[in-house]
């Protein structure tokens, strides 16, 4: 049985960048619905490891709801209140970003462009091999995601309406770079 993870911060902790009402609905309604629907769909015979299940199943409803649960569970970990966020990548992560993208600003520009270019609902990811990947709907990226941005409208519409660019700019203020570094290092 899959469970809704608790947020690693209070629902108001990401203000003013991501508002309380959005967090309450995003986590407590959208993510909770993915978990409930997934539990209604899986059987005792199904793979218990969610990532493996999503990679092997042909059941589109399991992929949609399981992907929603998996992606959001990662997403919450990758966020932190602005006061707790280091504000930028450091250490090995920063070295790899600099080597791949020239510098942190170059990475942010490319990641933001991918997020703005994602037509419709989906996600943008940075994978462990430092590839920026956008996926439709609740699909998982190829590779191991270390940073993800939800660009479904439910993630930002209450505060930002149709201004996805403003949401993305605000989101950079609450990225939990320490968590991204720990995922990269495999110490999650």
Q: What do the predicted segments below correspond to?
A:
Residues 81-82, 91-121, 129:
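Conserved, well-structured core segments that form or line functional sites
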Residues 16-32, 50-71, 137-150:
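Alpha-helical scaffold segments that form or flank carboxylate-/histidine-based iron centers
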Residues 12-14:
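Secretory/endomembrane lumenal or extracellular ectodomains immediately following the signal peptide
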Residues 87:
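Short Gly/Ser/Thr- and charged-rich N-terminal loops/segments
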Residues 179-182, 187-188:
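Protein-protein interaction regions
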Residues 27-38, 62-76, 100, 104, ...:
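Alpha-helical transition-metal enzyme core signature, strongest for iron centers
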Residues 1-10:
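Acidic, low-complexity proline/glycine-rich segments
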Residues 113-163, 168-178:
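An amphipathic alpha-helical core segment
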């Amino acid at each position: 049985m899959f469970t809704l993870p608790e947020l690693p911060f209070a629902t108001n902790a990401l203000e003013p960048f991501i508002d309380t009402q959005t967090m309450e609905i995003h986590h407590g309604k959208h993510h909770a619905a993915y978990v409930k629907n997934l539990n209604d769909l899986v059987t005792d015979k199904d793979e218990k490891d969610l990532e493996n299940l999503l990679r092997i199943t042909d059941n589109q409803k399991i992929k949609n709801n399981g992907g929603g649960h998996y992606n959001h569970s990662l997403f919450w970990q990758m966020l932190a209140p602005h006061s707790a966020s280091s504000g930028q990548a450091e250490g090995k992560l920063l070295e790899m970003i600099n080597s791949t993208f020239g510098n942190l600003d170059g990475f942010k520009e490319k990641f933001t462009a991918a997020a703005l270019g994602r037509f419709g609902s989906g996600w943008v990811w940075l994978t462990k091999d430092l590839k920026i990947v956008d996926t439709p709907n609740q699909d998982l990226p190829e590779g191991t995601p270390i940073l993800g941005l939800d660009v479904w409208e439910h993630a930002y519409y209450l505060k930002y309406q149709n201004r996805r660019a403003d949401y993305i700019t605000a989101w950079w203020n609450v990225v939990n770079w320490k968590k991204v570094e720990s995922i990269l290092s495999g110490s999650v």
